[in-house]
Amino acid sequence: DPDKCKTIRVESWSYKYAEKVVEDASYVLNMTVVDRQSAAACTLGESFGYQKATLWVDHGCRADFKVCYLPVMPTECQTLRVESWNYKYAEKVVEGAALFINMTVEDRQSEASCDLDKSFGFYNQNSTVWVNHGCRADFNICYLKGAVTTSTINVSSWNYQYATKVLPAASCIYSMRVVNQQSAAPCTLGTTYGFVANTMWVDDGCRADFKPSYYSP
């Protein structure tokens, strides 16, 4: 499998913040409590969580966690020009990018400033980089390469009902984007369509042909 799982103990003593780096991980995918050691609660996002390859605990949470992650893999970097004309939002898909590591300005073309997360950034959910507010630049973009990109797959929410489609060949979908929308209802990533593990989902009337990218076992 491209992703690995193991049990790791992380402990917040005296209710203080603590963290632990998963040495062979490039990105943690999920973290769940297997055996709580503390009287204090362990709540995802409040008293434990993760960012990139680092696990953290706080507020007295002490537990053994099941941690699944992408092991360290070779990265690829490329220079890509992305431009916000007339101060409008624009985006560009980075083909083959599974998880972005960083995006830095190499050569700014615009008078407008380019500030990370304000006028440029990236979305791991659909392998996309974006600019806004007049930022135009050549960016150095580094990322983990993806393994498999499929042809289009139709997933439809009929009568505004929630619907799913499993990709048996996938162990972990990392992006999903609309290729051809059939519904009048909007298809918005994270709201009316998305993915979990190897399953694509739609809701609230979104019907479209999607192009998912994924790791395969």
Swiss-Prot record:
Post-translational modification (record): Contains disulfide bonds.
BP GO annotations: positive regulation of erythrocyte aggregation
UniProt keyword terms in alphabetical order: Disulfide bond, Glycoprotein, Hemagglutinin, Lectin
Tree of life domain: Eukaryota
Glycoprotein as UniProt keyword: yes
GO molecular function terms noted in the UniProt entry: galactose binding; galactoside binding; galacturonate binding; lactose binding; melibiose binding
Thermal dependence of function as given in the entry: Activity is stable up to 60 degrees Celsius, then decreases and is lost at 80 degrees Celsius.
Keyword Disulfide bond: yes
pH dependence, entry free text: Optimum pH is 6-7.
InterPro entries linked: DUF3011
Disulfide cross-links: 5-187, 42-68, 61-77, 114-135, 142-206
Pfam families reported in the protein's UniProt record: DUF3011
Glycosylation sites: 30, 102, 126
Transmembrane segments: none
Quaternary data: Homodimer; disulfide-linked.
Function, in words: Binds in decreasing order of affinity: galacturonic acid, D-galactosamine, methyl-alpha-D-galactopyranoside and further galactose-containing carbohydrates. Has hemagglutinating activity against human and rabbit erythrocytes.
Protein name (database record): Lectin ADEL
Native source species: Aplysia dactylomela
